[in-house]
Regions:
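S-adenosyl-L-methionine
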Residues: 1-50, 56, 58-85
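Receiver (REC) domain switch-region micro-motif
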Residues: 24, 91, 143
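Short, well-ordered alpha-helices that flank and scaffold nucleotide-derived cofactor binding pockets
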Residues: 36-40, 62, 122-125
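Conserved beta-strand segments of alpha/beta enzyme cores
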Residues: 45-48, 67-68, 213-215
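Conserved short alpha-helix immediately C-terminal to the canonical SAM/SAH-binding motif I
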Residues: 55-59, 116
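Redox-cofactor binding/interface segments in oxidoreductases and associated redox assembly factors
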Residues: 72, 92-93, 145
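Class I S-adenosyl-L-methionine
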Residues: 80-88, 97-319
């Protein structure tokens, strides 16, 4: 509700797809949203969760006290040691999305950040090799990956060029001198449009080479009861011969569907907060355009405008 008490009415798990003894692993675990979804769907907390950030791990630990937490660089984790011979039934990864998001615009990208999805292949490869050597069955049976849908354009990076001179843009914002060699580490890197999606296709092919059937879809959060219209790319992969089953939307305008949840239903407007227009760092042009579009659509041109008026007593109420 508008007092901040809105909650989702997720159905309790009826038949878990996990087999006896299987565990759940959550990479890039933040506040615990994905882990909570997995818990509600599968009926158990993740056994292992990873993040390099102290605050993220702290929040996840508060929300999932039964999970063993590893605060470390995910590239340095030892899956064979941490799994300890237990079969991984579901393996989830939500790698950093900022270097694929359209909100990044023309800003420089990071090779290392964009490569984080490959960690999933590292886990799978190491566990498959251990299984082959030891006669175990620890490698993930089901894999899920969530990211912005622009990850479908994942490909190589190239140096950003000055539009006026055609020369390389350096990380300090200056333009390379004529004939100057700029090391890659000092270049502003942007996606190479000539090879858009090449690395994504290689990633999928690598999963398939490990015996996984792979599918992906772009899903809209508001179709499933969340108070946001954000679109996300979900990849599912499994190597047990079973079909991949996608959920059907539960919210929308079609007959029999639940009404979509508004973001306002999840907010408590009585809590004081600073204005986004008074922040030190100015809003991006794309954000300002979205705000203007929202004001036009939901306030100025709406027959039932959404307004939060301030009363003379200083309190707010939602119309």
């Amino acid at each position: 509700m508008a007092d901040g008490s809105h909650s989702f009415n997720f159905p309790a798990p009826q038949v878990s797809c996990l087999r006896p003894g299987e565990i759940v692993v959550d990479l890039f675990a933040g506040g615990g949203g994905a882990s909570e979804a997995l818990k509600q769907a599968l009926g158990i907390d993740p056994a292992l969760a990873y993040n390099h950030d102290e605050w993220a791990i702290g929040m996840h630990a508060a929300n999932h006290p039964l999970t063993i937490h590893h605060r470390e660089d995910i590239w340095h984790a030892d899956p064979r040691k941490d799994v300890a011979g237990r079969p991984v039934g579901w393996f989830h990864a939500s790698p950093d999305c900022t270097h694929f998001s359209q909100a990044k615009g023309g800003q420089p990208r990071s090779h290392k950040t964009r490569a984080l999805s490959w960690v999933a292949l590292k886990w799978i490869g190491q566990l498959l090799r251990a299984d082959l050597r030891d006669g175990t069955n620890t490698a993930p049976r089901i894999l899920s990956l969530e990211n912005v849908w622009q990850i479908l354009t994942w490909g190589p990076l190239v140096a950003k060029r000055c539009k006026a001179t055609g020369r390389v843009m350096k990380m300090d914002g200056t333009v390379a001198a004529r004939g100057e060699h700029v090391p890659v580490a000092n270049q502003q890197l942007v996606p190479d449009k000539r090879h858009s999606g090449r690395t994504w296709r290689q990633f999928v092919a690598a999963l398939e080479s490990k015996g996984y059937r792979v599918e992906w879809r772009k899903l809209t959060a508001s179709d499933f009861g969340a108070g946001t219209s954000r679109e996300r790319l979900f990849l599912l992969a499994r190597r047990d011969g079973q079909p991949i089953v996608w959920p059907a939307p539960t919210h929308g305008t079609a007959p029999g569907m639940q009404p979509r949840v508004r973001a306002a239903d999840c907010l408590d407007f009585s809590i004081p907060c600073p204005s986004i227009f008074t922040r030190k760092r100015p809003l991006a042009d794309a954000t300002l355009r979205r705000i203007a579009k929202g004001v036009m659509r939901h306030v100025l041109q709406s027959a039932d405008p959404f307004i939060v008026p301030a009363t003379h007593q200083g309190s707010d109420r939602v119309n």
